């Protein structure tokens, strides 16, 4: 997009962004599910017009800014919620459109708009004002306002590159050690001591976004858990298997159903993302495939998972912001309020009890209304785990696809190496997955075929 002189402003439509269209996938396809329209990465959300209407922000000259790879861009917030870039006078319909345009000027390879996480209003990220809006209006928000047409992405930070799926911790690390070096990294993992939420205070740009935060209990903040959760054992088995395959972080989505009458969220299926976090080109196809799988099975998008390969299964500050952003997106569903479950899996942390992975379901409560610049509060979610009758063909096929995907990966785990003096890594995986076994004991023979494939990858 070329620059226009101030006397002839160019209006950049939000929908004109090729990158936003790529990432949104089936944006106009109604999945007939409580997750509403849009792909798994983007969906209709709160707009600047909504924040202006409700008094959370005010129009003004030079109140918006983007800091990206050492460059600063300044914009005016107009009365109608549009953005005028001060340097050229161009008009943009959304933060995503402006952010994408500016970032492409600095880095032409940039593939994604990321306005709400990158654009700042009076020095504070716009996503923080979304959080304040959610706190005031959840769960009885005006759905017509929520769907006014902002597409944004899950938490693309100002200075960081290389993500294609939902934001995860350590996304900007250029390389990670092989698992056989895990003994060398054990001491470093333990030095990442989680902090208590009460010690965080107001957001501080100087604080490491990878800082881990202990989970609070709903009762500790004088709340009741506003929904019940049931998770299928097959979901845990596939997720745990996925997280064990590589020494790098992985991500995936959770499909299920939300019953507004019983306030029960049932997680029935895991959908691993078979793509590298830095592979921008492959992400849209992977997202579209998962979107179609959800639709064909009559499931809704109900959450996401990611791994902390060698660290505690606790959310980082970055994870907290990502989870809050996900919750905002599902807030705009056709059923009104719908929870979005976050799960962190820690497969190779030596602080785990025994050989089993630590699996942590969590949710984020918006900060107190009088402290809108605080981080959201990460809370532990009580979950009922439901043992499936048998291992489904879907799960088995997905496991085999994952083996093939990571077969030649440089960070593939060395399964024959030792996890402990008496336990190989493959034996550790078997033991961890046995904790998610179905009732039908024939599953062990079925999984042995998968384990043989793992042996053949070395």
Swiss-Prot record:
DNA binds at residues 94, 96, 116. Residues 14-28, 148-161 have a biased composition (Acidic residues). One of its GO terms (molecular function) is metal ion binding. Its EC number is 3.4.-.-. Gene3D superfamilies: Cytidine Deaminase, domain 2. Residues 42-137 form the RAMA domain. A motif (JAMM motif) lies at residues 306-319. Coiled coil: none annotated. It holds the Pfam family RAMA. Belongs to the peptidase M67 family. PANTHER family: EUKARYOTIC TRANSLATION INITIATION FACTOR 3 -RELATED. This is MPN domain-containing protein. It comes from Danio rerio (Zebrafish). The gene is mpnd.
